[in-house]
Amino acid sequence: MADLQFTKGQGTGNDFVLFADPAGEIDLTDTQVQALCDRHFGIGADGTIRAVLSTRIPEGRAALEEDPDAEWFMDYRNVDGSPAEMCGNGIRVFTLFLIENGLIELPPGRTIPIGTRAGVRDVQRSGSGFQVDLGRWELAGGEPLVRAKDLQVARPGLGIDVGNPHVVVALSSEDELAEADLAFVPQLDPEPAAGANVELVVPADPLVVDGVGHITMRVHERGSGETLSCGTGAAAAALATRHWAGAAAPHQWRVQLPGGALGVRMFPTEDGEHVGLSGPAELVFDGVVALA
């Protein structure tokens, strides 16, 4: 039985077990990930994040082909042990973990490329947290019908890919949002081959205040269940709401989640429109746990 040195971290309540494995020698099994994330018998988290040098794993070497400066790879695993392409909250916490453990230097205002399964993502440190360029996004997956427990009827969703798949559903009121039971997996028809995260969204009234759009959302994350926050989900929800609102909709958004607020902005680049995410990150405590 080996010991694992870990750090518990969170971003707007989306929490993670992080550990450094520069040489790529600690390949957790699905069962070990599940045990670490168990909130009753383990540490408790929405997922695990391994900090591994990009040169030491195949996915990292692919990231280096995209950007030779992407020295570190974020190996994210969901509660069930399945790998995730990207985590918008996790990458902010991951970057803070690298800084606090002396693995990188990143003064405020500077940017660092991080390897992920969705490709390289640029992270900038700010005075109050981190901003992440999530890259290009696209409408993907059509408009599947979504059935969630305690919602009276099936609703049309909008498929959006921001490096990982999402289906966003608009609801009419915060009361309706509160009634949905996301402890159960929402049913999608048709079901995406790789599954999807599902966001339930309520636009604010008024929608836009001082040029910023406002929405409230909850999320069921594929492989993890309902979480207090999902960064890529917040981006997908803002993109979907802008799509529904039409050409006059803003490109700056404030997304309120159970765990706190995140900022989303859309901006043009040479290779098309990108979406950015901003929010806080915190390292909560360090510890050592025995791996079964």
Swiss-Prot record:
EC number(s) reported in the record: 5.1.1.7
Record: residues binding substrate: 14, 78, 88-89, 164, 197, 221-222, 231-232
SUPFAM superfamilies found in the cross-reference section: Diaminopimelate epimerase-like
Superkingdom, taxonomy of origin: Bacteria
InterPro entries reported in the protein's UniProt record: DAP_epimerase_AS (IPR018510), DAP_epimerase_DapF (IPR001653)
Keyword entries, A-Z: Amino-acid biosynthesis, Cytoplasm, Isomerase, Lysine biosynthesis
Pathway membership, UniProt: Amino-acid biosynthesis; L-lysine biosynthesis via DAP pathway; DL-2,6-diaminopimelate from LL-2,6-diaminopimelate: step 1/1
NCBIfam families according to UniProt: DapF
Name of the featured protein: Diaminopimelate epimerase
Gene behind the chain: dapF
